[in-house]
Amino acid sequence: MSQIYTSAEQLIGHTPLMELCRTEQQNHLAARLLVKLECFNPGGSVKDRVALSMLDDAEERGILKPGATVIEPTSGNTGIGLAAVAGARGYRVIIVMPDSMSMERQKLMRGYGAELVLTPGAKGMTGAVEKANELQQSIPGSFVAGQFDNPANALAHYRTTGPELWADTDGKIDAFVAGIGTGGTVTGTGRYLKEQNPAIRVIAVEPAASPLLSQGKAGPHGLQGIGANCVPKVLDTGVYDEISPVTEEQAYAAARSLARTEGLLVGISAGAALHAALELAKRPDSAGNTIVALLPDTGERYLSTPLFD
């Protein structure tokens, strides 16, 4: 039977779930270690789901009108997703991003036709959010998607990511591991999975150099895509059972190992989630468990960073 898609939006979601068999063997794991490969979304990251959900919600509620300008503060991937989806729908797109993010992310957004406004990296996402709000005040009829505050962010994962994981594992999942940037992935996916089975453990990953959730301290770090140095409104802190701090070196090492062991090139935050999942899988009490880590994006957008040096 033929299967022909008529828009890139139809390609979002239903990403593959893969067992890391070689990694399991090398580390003598007694647990199954699975990864959700979000780089298979058309925009190359998990944030395609969020972009689509926020735009659909805004259009349905009548707050996003034809010909309007979509503005978004983002560390990169949401900007790429919005640039692709909103641009294809005919909206003007302005992305506000810290200048510390990779050049690949900047070029990708421009490639999709978005306008890019850079803010000082030292101010993190807080600086980008402030600038986006300034732009909204100066551009009539503009819409700030607001992924850090927008319930449609977490809803995307509640409606898609969670159900996909539950179906693909046939309900046999013991732990879910994901990094926290906006908190949408952990909140939406975690809620859905715990509704199916309250015993499922949700592990939140944050930068060790900015342990805001675990220790109340924020600071600069090198884990692009997570650790926004604020507690987003989207994040439900009651969903996760444990916080796993990961260093930049640990994230890099995990991503490099995955490329050379499994042939999968993933990004920095994916390396962080993988490291946390691997450490969980090594615990004696994880024997026989199925652990799933969500890997947000492809490593190709980090080739200008030291990730694969």
Residue ranges of each PLM-predicted region?
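PLP-dependent amino-acid enzyme catalytic core
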Residues: 1-309
